[in-house]
Amino acid sequence: MHYPEPISKLIDSFMKLPGIGPKTAQRLAFHTLDMKEDDVVKFAKALVDVKRELTYCSVCGHITENDPCYICEDKQRDRSVICVVEDDKDVIAMEKMREYKGLYHVLHGSISPMDGIGPEDINIPALVERLKNDEVKELILAMNPNLEGESTAMYISRLVKPIGIKVTRLAQGLSVGGDLEYADEVTLSKAIAGRTEM
C-alpha cells in the first residue's frame, strides 16, 4: 500500500516500538492524524523530553531526573543489600511491592552469547566497582527466569563469591521464561522473602 511520505515515516517510527507490528503502527499513525494538533505537539514533546531530561544514575544505573537517583540518595535504605535487576522496569516492579528497602543495580540487559552480548556489554563492571564498598553484605540476583537471566545470575555469582559477599537468588514462583516486570506484588514479595543462597 502506498501512503503519503509523512504517514509512511510515522508508521515506520511506530514499528520501532516493541510489540508494534505493521497493522498496529498503521492504526496508531491514522489515529495521530485524527488528533488535535496541540495534542500531537504535546505527545511529540513528551517523547523528546524523555530523551533529553532523563539520565542514568551514576551509582545504580536506574533512570532519573537527578543524579544520583532518589533511591541511592535515600539515607533510610539498607546499604548492605543490593538487588541486581536487568532493567529499569524491574526496579519499578520491585518498588511497587513496598517491602524491599535495600539498593538496586540496573544491568541494562543480560548476557546473551547468541546475540553477541557479553558481561562487558552490560553494567557488570560498574557493579564490581560498587562491591568494593565494605558496606555491601548481600547481593540479591533478581534476573528474569529465562536462559539469559540464569546465565547472567550464574556469571555474577561466580564473579562475586570470592569477594565474600552473600549472593542470593529470588525464590521460584516466578514463571520460567517470564519477565520480572509482569509479576504481581504478592509473587515478588514471596520471591524476595524466600530467596536462596547461590
UniProtKB/Swiss-Prot annotation:
GO molecular function: DNA binding; zinc ion binding
Superkingdom field: Bacteria
Family as reported in the entry's similarity comment: Belongs to the RecR family.
Biological process terms in GO annotation: DNA recombination; DNA repair
UniProt keyword terms in alphabetical order: DNA damage, DNA recombination, DNA repair, Metal-binding, Zinc, Zinc-finger
C4-type zinc finger span: 57-72
InterPro entries hit by this protein: DNA_Rcmb_RecR (IPR000093), Hlx-hairpin-Hlx_DNA-bd_motif (IPR003583), Rcmb_RecR (IPR023627), Rcmb_RecR_Znf (IPR015967), TOPRIM_dom (IPR006171), TOPRIM_RecR (IPR034137)
Pfam families the record matches: RecR_C, RecR_HhH, RecR_ZnF, Toprim_4
PANTHER family: RECOMBINATION PROTEIN RECR (PTHR30446:SF0)
Every Toprim domain range: 80-175
Lineage: Bacteria, Bacillati, Bacillota, Bacilli, Bacillales
Keyword Metal-binding set for record: yes
Protein name: Recombination protein RecR
Gene it is expressed from: recR
Transmembrane segments: none
Function statement: May play a role in DNA repair. It seems to be involved in an RecBC-independent recombinational process of DNA repair. It may act with RecF and RecO.
Entries under HAMAP family matching the protein: RecR
Statement: the UniProt record of this protein carries the keyword DNA damage: yes
